Amino acid sequence: MIYQGFASVYDELMSHAPYDQWTKWIEASLPEKGRILDLACGTGEISIRLAEKGFEVTGIDLSEEMLSFAQQKVSSSQPILFLQQDMREITGFDGQFDAVVICCDSLNYLKTKNDVIETFKSVFRVLKPEGILLFDVHSSFKIAEVFPDSTFADQDEDISYIWQSFAGSDELSVIHDMSFFVWNGEAYDRFDETHEQRTFPVEEYEEMLKNCGFQLHRVTADFTDTEPSAQSERLFFKAQKSKTIVS
């Protein structure tokens, strides 16, 4: 399962991730603080920040291991509900959320258009009328031009890793092969993981959103308020649930 070993080192490896920028983008994109669903919430970093800002937060993730770490961070003053579910099949929350967010390119872990469509339909069901969907994805440029044949590495006393990326077999997909070396007090334990991500052109995301009952309001790039360019690497989408009923 994705993140089975990754969960134990995820927070340390992501210690410099721009979580505050994601939170700022979410706040700026929503008209008021209401009930929000953080899909693919991971270890809860964004969920916790949103709760601190005054949102009523529910976090959902596929990984039980990630959710275990998320739950350990929550204090009694932050009543965040964390649940293990598949974002393509959210159950128990029909019409309950003012907004749904899918951050940190989590949507790129869905390998097919049908997976994305099922996720959008699932989100549509749990949103209140005219609720907001916010998500970010890697751009086509980043998947096709930046990641392939790239190697990332880092080393310190506790954790070291080698991260190699290469083009996947599907269009606009990439494979990440990762090897981690974690100090256990006496020696280094090694574990390996392979993750696959895929993206789609903006026009295809817009079409999928429309077919699932959403109106696309805006697409921006790289934590700015500007429209994407040919070299933008991360795209941010804001869509709103229309009055159309999707079965």
From Swiss-Prot:
Gene3D superfamilies, A to Z: S-adenosyl-L-methionine-dependent methyltransferases, Vaccinia Virus protein VP39
GO biological process: methylation
Listed Pfam families: Methyltransf_25
SUPFAM superfamilies: S-adenosyl-L-methionine-dependent methyltransferases
Keywords from the UniProt entry: Methyltransferase, S-adenosyl-L-methionine, Transferase
GO molecular-function terms, A-Z: methyltransferase activity
Enzyme Commission designation: 2.1.1.-
Family: Belongs to the methyltransferase superfamily.
PANTHER family, A to Z: TRANS-ACONITATE 2-METHYLTRANSFERASE, TRANS-ACONITATE 2-METHYLTRANSFERASE-RELATED
Its job: May be a S-adenosyl-L-methionine (SAM)-dependent methyltransferase.
Record protein name field: Putative methyltransferase YqeM
